[in-house]
Curated annotation (Swiss-Prot):
Entry-linked PANTHER family: SERINE PROTEASE 27 (PTHR24253:SF119), TRANSMEMBRANE PROTEASE SERINE (PTHR24253)
Broadest EC class assigned to this enzyme: hydrolase
A single GO BP: proteolysis
Signal peptide annotation: 1-22
Keyword check for Protein transport: no
Stated name of the protein: Serine protease 27
Propeptide: 23-37
GO cellular component entries: extracellular region; plasma membrane
InterPro entries according to UniProt: Peptidase_S1_PA (IPR009003), Peptidase_S1_PA_chymotrypsin (IPR043504), Peptidase_S1A (IPR001314), Trypsin_dom (IPR001254), TRYPSIN_HIS (IPR018114), TRYPSIN_SER (IPR033116)
Residues the record marks as active site: H78, D127, S232
Coiled-coil parts of chain: none
Disulfide linkage: C63-C79, C161-C238, C194-C217, C228-C256
Originating gene: Prss27
Origin species: Rattus norvegicus (Rat)
Major site of localization recorded for this protein: secreted
């Protein structure tokens, strides 16, 4: 007669896991353990951007991406023109150097790639894709997810954000060995100004590029600093309410670091519904207060609202406790 009691006990960890799995990434997201934010710096530090991943084809880096959950990476759709043979792809996590990833790095094969169905080619809207890993990764201080914003988060023009990647330092050069992860602080540019910049010095025989509603610009009107080839799919992150939140996915640009040609990113929040549809358990970061604040990241603690899933778990405990008392 005690079998239902045993069954309830066996179900308890499963129910708790299902109620808190999405919360695990939310509590861990956007809080790296290493801090060194030097404007104008180039080489990143180990563990400084723990969500940054290298997406590799036949063992060679070709695009960046960001870890958003134990089995999911966010990147650009244009990185995957052909996924007929998924076995050629793998993801490198926890690495600072591509050539010498080190003991904290991890290679994980790709299970599948989901590109946004509305993506229609380079410089078009919806240039986002989700890469599912074959096995879940364990979070460490070198491997952590970034937070994703819901539509309530507003990234204001002029806000300083950071872009990272192993791409080329210029249109002519390749990142020298051992290919250390690069970081760059860039200000956000509003859409009207970005469209104006792209209209300047435009060649008559080239179709004028326009910034769509789901795009975001960041960089400098004078050029000189920008993401480049090999950075595609990587994250543009901003500090919002004490957490690093991914504002954009590196999508396209006209050349690299050219005058009046800032980098163009896909707004993550614009594709909130699509991401949620594929990863329903993933939690998104909303605005904690009426105003966003940029603070010193040292000494961060998980946000209080992240405890909501724990309350749900407690409710499950109470319900199961009552059930077991009834059985006994």
């Amino acid at each position: 007669m005690r079998q239902p009691h045993i069954t309830a006990l066996l179900l308890l960890p499963l129910l708790l896991r299902s109620g808190t799995e999405g919360a695990e990434a939310m509590r861990a997201c956007g809080h790296p353990r290493m801090f060194n934010r030097m404007v104008g710096g180039e080489d990143a530090l180990e563990g400084e951007w723990p969500w940054q991943v290298s997406i590799q084809r036949n063992g060679a880096h070709f695009c960046g991406g960001s870890l958003i959950a134990p089995t999911w990476v966010l990147t650009a759709a244009h990185c995957f023109s052909n996924t007929s043979d998924i076995s050629i792809y793998q993801v490198l996590l926890g690495a600072l150097k591509l050539q010498q990833p080190g003991p904290h790095a991890l290679y994980v094969p790709v299970k599948r790639v989901k590109s946004h169905p509305e993506y229609q080619g380079m410089a078009s809207s919806a240039d986002v894709a989700l890469v599912e890993l074959q096995v879940p990764v364990t979070f460490t201080k070198y491997i952590l997810p970034v937070c994703l914003p819901d539509p309530s988060v507003v990234f204001k023009s002029g806000m300083n954000c950071w872009v990272t990647g192993w791409g080329s330092p210029s249109e002519q050069d390749r990142l020298p060995n051992p290919r250390i992860l690069q970081k760059l602080a860039v200000p956000l540019i509003d859409t009207p100004k970005c469209n104006l910049l792209y209209s300047k010095d435009a060649e008559a025989d080239i179709q004028l590029k326009t910034i769509k509603d789901d795009m975001l610009c960041a960089g400098f009107a004078e050029g000189k600093k920008d993401a480049c080839k090999g950075d595609s799919g990587g994250p543009l992150v901003c500090l919002v309410d004490q957490s690093w939140v991914q504002a954009g996915v590196i999508s396209w640009g006209e050349g690299c670091a050219r005058r009046n040609r800032p980098g163009v990113y896909i707004r993550v929040a614009s594709h909130y519904q699509w991401i949620h549809q594929i990863i329903p358990e993933l939690q998104f970061q909303g605005r904690a207060g009426s105003q966003q604040q940029q603070r010193d990241p040292r000494g961060w603690q998980p946000l209080a609202e992240n405890s909501a899933p724990c309350l749900a778990a407690h409710a499950v405990l109470l319900a199961l406790g009552a059930l077991m008392l009834g059985i006994l």
